[in-house]
Amino acid sequence: MTHFSTIGLIGHLNNERAVYSIERLIRFLQQRGKDFVLEVETAARISDIALTQAARQIMDMDALGQICDLVIVVGGDGSLLSGARALAKYQVPLLGVNRGRLGFLTDITPEQIEQKMAEVLTGQFASEKRFLLDMEVRRDGQVIALADALNDVVLHTGQFIHMLEFEIHVDGSFVTSQRSDGLIVSTPTGSTAYSLSGGGPILHPKLDAIVIVPMNPHTLSSRPIVVSGDSEILLMVGEHNRALPMVTCDGHSHAEVQTGDEIIIRKKPQLLELLHPLDYNFYERCRSKLGWGGHLLKPE
């Protein structure tokens, strides 16, 4: 049976429903006699002083990642993405409680908190490894920006609506030059997010692959490409861009790039471990979240 000795709690700061669910989690962990720590900004949102005082410690994200053997993220998919980027380097597993809208990554619903947490604490869960992307921007051979992403790295025009010109290279080989609104480089995790909206394929989370999705390309033959998860992708910004392009990781970590800059994207060495309830099923998740069709005939 898996034993989690120290459990970290992180919540969406601007979501009162998330705060309420964290308070429920604290009471549940207290009843089970479990040590828990609170992320410092999360603790500041809890009005019941007795609950924050019950925490073993209140600490920042890095310290939390170093001492916890399980971190519960309460919020939407964005909250889990933020937690993943901050904690992947510490190899601490994450479990999501959904207080957002879609909930592709946050499995446990609010009404299931006590039941599903009891199962997890007794070892009844499924574990899954997901990879992140490392992104760096080089200018004249010098690294000027670094970031990582669980979902996607996006090259785009920022606030201006202009075509971008750039080249795509994979593993040192020139692939194509492109004029488009931008490019999405996505993990399997991100393939059900922005990449999907851009016409990219859905990749099963266990696939070791990266998908490259053009955004409104000027050439109709420019289609999404799936490459090996071990590939190094290089984007080179062209000369004839009327606006300074931007690079975004999971919707955050903006970096402004200019002519001649190189954007290098590769798999992050550290994998993220996600925990799921035992009844988790990726295809069921797609059906329920994306509105896929059910059985034509009810199973007997």
From Swiss-Prot:
Its EC number is 2.7.1.23. Signal peptide: none annotated. It catalyses: NAD(+) + ATP = ADP + NADP(+) + H(+). Keywords: ATP-binding, Cytoplasm, Kinase, NAD, NADP, Nucleotide-binding, Transferase. It is found in: Cytoplasm. It comes from the Bacteria. Pfam families: NAD_kinase, NAD_kinase_C. Its cofactor is a divalent metal cation. GO terms for cellular component: cytoplasm. InterPro entries: ATP-NAD_kinase_N, ATP-NAD_kinase_PpnK-typ_C, NAD/diacylglycerol_kinase_sf, NADK. One of its GO terms (biological process) is NAD metabolic process. The active site is at residue 77. NAD(+) binds at residues 77-78, 151-152, 162, 179, 181, 192-197. GO terms for molecular function: ATP binding; metal ion binding; NAD binding; NAD+ kinase activity. HAMAP family: NAD_kinase. PANTHER family: NAD KINASE (PTHR20275:SF0). Belongs to the NAD kinase family. Involved in the regulation of the intracellular balance of NAD and NADP, and is a key enzyme in the biosynthesis of NADP. Catalyzes specifically the phosphorylation on 2'-hydroxyl of the adenosine moiety of NAD to yield NADP. This is NAD kinase. It comes from Cellvibrio japonicus (strain Ueda107) (Pseudomonas fluorescens subsp. cellulosa). The gene is nadK.
